[in-house]
Amino acid sequence: MIKTKPISFCNNIVDNFMDSKDKQFLIDKLYNSYQISITDKDYIIMKDSYFPILKNNLHYVTLMSNGNKYFLYLTTLNDIPICLFIDRKVKDGYNQPRILSVKYDFHLELHKKDTLFGGELIKTNNNKWKFVIYNLYLYCGEDK
């Protein structure tokens, strides 16, 4: 049984994972299955030497804001589909990131085979929260 505690998050109530073993299981699953580390940076700083490569090959580039960086992980736990926000940073004094279970409606196949988005939570001018996706790391278990 997964130990969670309800907390306020982005103007909603979500379930915060409390047990370090549950968190470590998810962190290990991402790393051992897909070599994805929670705290690895996923951006590069542009240098002049990169421009010839960009000019000669099709690329999609996004700007990153100062939002809070999270993974949105669609997976199953005990055969139950679950959507998890995994904080991309570990707060001082902690060994693991915050992991939150949220209620989103995605196709079941995305959960069964693991899907992972990278993005930022951004608060709008009217105090609403948006998750802006800037990367797709896994699509149904396949590295993208």
Language model: regions and residue ranges:
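Active-site-proximal "nucleotidyltransferase
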Residues: 1-113, 118
